[in-house]
């Protein structure tokens, strides 16, 4: 009996353009599939077309936009964990986590969230 390998976790990163490239590189090198968004419209489109294992909102996103993005994710994907880099928006209900903005902090936080969901792992594990 052969086991079929599960695909690596699918992540959505929301950030301003310069921050986006760096985080994309970190996560792809760690073996994750990653989709990016730079605006609320792009977040809406992404969340309507795919189910993400984790949504990351970078610290480069202004606080009012973080709130709107968080509410959009909750509307389309109520169970998706949201990992906020930098300061957390306390008004985002549900699975919301916070991490620093270092490469190690982001990768460790994503892995910890996914380990709570046994069926999902990055490709490198």
What is the role of each PLM region?
Residues 55-77, 93:
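Conserved phosphotransfer microenvironments
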Residues 13-17, 38, 57-61, 85-87, ...:
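Structural motif
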Residues 38-54:
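Acidic, metal-coordinating helix/loop segments flanking the phosphotransfer/catalytic sites
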Residues 39-43, 65, 102:
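Short acidic active-site motifs
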Residues 17-35:
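Two-component/phosphorelay signaling modules centered on CheY-like receiver
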Residues 70-73, 79-91, 98:
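A short, hydrophobic beta-strand element within the central beta-sheet of small alpha/beta folds
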